[in-house]
């Protein structure tokens, strides 16, 4: 099994079929590659790209142009998230089909639970394509 929650030492040595309990409050917020967007990784599988993350967006923060490589699911815990297709508000859910592309912003800020089957591909003005952490997408995920 390659799935893990980074920076949680209590999971080391657990059997392959043991449940992994995560104290989210004690996980540190990590900066993304985008201003005003921080995250906590709850689950990641470095081999497949499966990712569950808590995302915190400051008021006015934007997730720039990106493509969902597989189905993406977002539950809004606080605030609202807006894109050209519509708006999802606190307590509501949106999912996006594989290969859908958009940018999204949080005018008043937002707290989101995101579930990804493979990380998003972000498109930059210089022509580069990266993942959420700014790593070259193809080198990282198309091995």
Predicted features, each with a name:
Residues 1-48, 129-143:
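A short, N-terminal "cap"/entry segment at the start of jelly-roll beta-barrel domains
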Residues 39-41, 52-54, 73, 93-95, ...:
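Conserved hydrophobic/aromatic beta-strand scaffold that supports enzyme active sites
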Residues 47-49, 59-63, 82, 100, ...:
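Short, charged/polar surface micro-motifs in flexible loops or helix N-caps
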Residues 53-55, 64-68, 84-86, 104-106:
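Short histidine-centered beta-strand/loop micro-motifs
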Residues 58-59, 68-83, 90:
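Glycine- and acidic-residue-biased ligand/ion/polar-headgroup-sensing regions
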Residues 62, 92-93, 111:
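Residue-level marker of beta-strand positions
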Residues 82-103:
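Short acidic-glycine-tyrosine-enriched beta hairpin
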Residues 98-126:
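Ligand-binding loop in jelly-roll beta-barrel domains
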């Amino acid at each position: 099994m390659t799935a893990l929650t980074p920076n949680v030492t209590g999971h080391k040595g657990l059997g392959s079929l043991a449940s992994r309990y995560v104290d989210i409050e004690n996980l540190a917020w990590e900066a993304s590659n985008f201003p005003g967007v921080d995250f906590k990784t709850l689950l990641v599988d470095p081999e497949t790209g499966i990712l569950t993350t808590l995302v915190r967006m400051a008021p006015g923060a934007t997730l720039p142009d990106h493509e969902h490589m597989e189905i993406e699911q977002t539950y809004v815990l606080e605030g609202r998230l807006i894109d050209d297709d519509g708006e999802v508000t606190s307590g509501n859910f949106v999912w996006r089909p594989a290969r859908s592309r958009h940018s999204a912003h949080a005018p008043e800020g937002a707290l989101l639970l995101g579930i990804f089957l493979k990380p998003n591909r972000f498109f930059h003005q210089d022509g580069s394509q990266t993942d959420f952490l700014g790593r070259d997408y193809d080198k990282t995920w198309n091995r």
